[in-house]
Design a protein with these regions (language model features):
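Noncatalytic, beta-rich nucleic-acid-contacting surfaces in large DNA/RNA-processing enzymes
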Residues: 1-445
Length: 445
């Protein structure tokens, strides 16, 4: 699949998700991230204790993604390849409005309903009912009470179907032997969701379209055509001072992962000097870990302020100045301190992120016992466990961060060394957005 893409002028991303931590994937050319160089853990991708199926997600340039899917259909047969159905459900606000409309509520009442349901992800009608204003609306009259009861019964039911944005199933036998199928816009479509398809052993691969890969490819083609220069993105230097000057100045409009005002502000304060700085920024600038950005920047500029809970944590946290950023660091700490295998450490990481109290208590004792067997005192063992528990909820997969930071660096390199081609392609991709077009033109000047 990757070989076809690379030999048919379809740009492929350097890697995505935990699969970039696989040395086999790197050696086969599936990814272009060296897991030994970047200290990535294979066990984050696959380990003996993992009970769920691993998968390799692949980024293709968005303008040629369909070409790869067509290749798969031709190679394996149209009855062996399908997309995956997804179901939209009647969530609180949608079901409340739909039922109200059917019961003859006027537009004013429907708008009132929308305003009375709090804007909270995943909120239920029962939760909304706890709010005094909503409860008063429900009991305003008998019709409203009937509306509420009907809405609660319908809440959560499937509302409509659509197609999974990236998932493709490939099977060695015709899929109609395994799953109910229907016809989608571009071929077969399972009538089972991704979870149900995986449960019976069907292989799912995510074929994702990434606009930034299309931009990179177009720049490379145009530079070759106009200047007769072959840009080998696998051979560019990762210590280019001009690139880091660009990043330090916050001139990252149009750069993958780095173009928002917030990230640009962080880059200016951080003054990145190494590729690792880019990896850290792309991992930290998310809800949750953002609160650690000031600490990270302060310690980056003041190494004497870096502190570790225990000296044994220094080799693991040195590159991030004592701040836990990556999921792999949590696994390394569990291995170093408690003697966990990397498979056991991944189970611990998953338990922490899901916050299952029963499993967490079991894993806590497992960790403390292992740490004590390794010569750590009970108090420091508990402190280290609490430390990784704090960060586990939003630790970022380092393999993914390195992969996407590579795309960001490549775009920064092209912007510095081939600015005319960079701006021309970016402007072509923001047609229709006056704000983005104006920002790009201002920066280009």
């Amino acid at each position: 699949l990757i070989h076809f893409a690379k030999t048919h002028e379809v740009m492929v991303g350097p890697g995505r998700g935990s699969s970039a931590g696989s040395l086999v994937s790197y050696l086969l050319g599936i990814t272009t991230i060296d897991p030994l160089k970047y200290n990535l853990l294979f066990e984050r991708f696959l380990n003996p204790e993992r009970v769920t199926m691993p998968d390799i997600d692949i980024d293709f340039e968005d303008t040629r993604r369909e070409k790869v899917i067509k290749y798969v259909q031709d190679k394996y047969g149209e009855h062996h390849v399908s997309g995956i159905v997804t179901f939209g459900h009647l969530l609180a606000r949608a079901v409340a409005r739909d039922v109200g409309r059917i019961m003859g509520f006027d537009e004013t009442s429907l708008n009132e309903i929308s305003k009375l349901i709090p804007h909270k992800l995943g909120i239920t009608l029962e939760e909304a009912y706890q709010k005094p204003e909503f409860k008063a609306f429900v009991h305003r009259n008998h019709r409203n009470e009937r509306w509420f009861e009907v809405s609660k019964k319908l809440e959560g039911l499937p509302r409509h179907t659509s197609t999974h944005a990236a998932g493709i199933i490939i099977n060695d036998q015709p899929l109609f032997k395994f799953a109910p199928l229907t016809t989608g816009d571009t071929g077969l479509l399972t009538q089972w969701t991704m979870t149900e398809a995986e449960r019976i052993g069907l292989l799912k691969i995510d074929f994702l379209g990434l606009r930034n890969l299309s931009i990179i490819h177009q720049i490379i083609l145009q530079v070759k055509k106009d200047l007769n220069i072959n840009i080998d993105i696998e051979a560019i230097p990762y210590d280019d001072k001009k690139v880091f000057d660009l990043l330090s100045n916050g001139d990252t409009t149009g750069i993958f992962q780095l173009e928002s005002d917030g990230v640009r502000s962080v880059l200016k304060r951080l003054q990145p000097e190494h590729f690792e700085d880019i990896v850290a920024v792309t991992s930290l600038y998310r809800p949750g870990p953002m609160e650690e950005i000031p600490t990270y920047i302060t310690r980056r500029h003041n190494p004497n302020q870096v502190a570790y809970l225990h000296p044994d944590l220094e080799p693991i946290l040195k590159n991030t100045y004592g701040v836990i950023i990556y999921q792999e660091q949590i696994m390394l700490i569990a291995s170093q301190v408690a003697g966990f295998s990397y498979g056991e450490a991944d189970i611990l990481r998953r338990a922490m992120s899901k916050k299952n109290r029963a499993i967490l208590e079991s894993e806590r004792q497992h960790f403390i016992d292992g740490a004590k067997n390794n010569g750590y005192g009970e108090q420091i063992s508990k402190q280290i466990f609490d430390l990784i528990l704090k960060f586990a909820d939003y630790g970022f997969p380092r393999a993914h961060a390195v992969s996407y930071s590579k795309i960001a660096y490549i775009m920064s390199y092209l912007k510095v060394h081939y600015p005319h081609y960079f701006y021309a392609n970016i402007l072509s991709n923001v047609i229709g957005s006056e704000k983005k077009t104006a920002a790009m033109i201002d920066e280009a000047k």
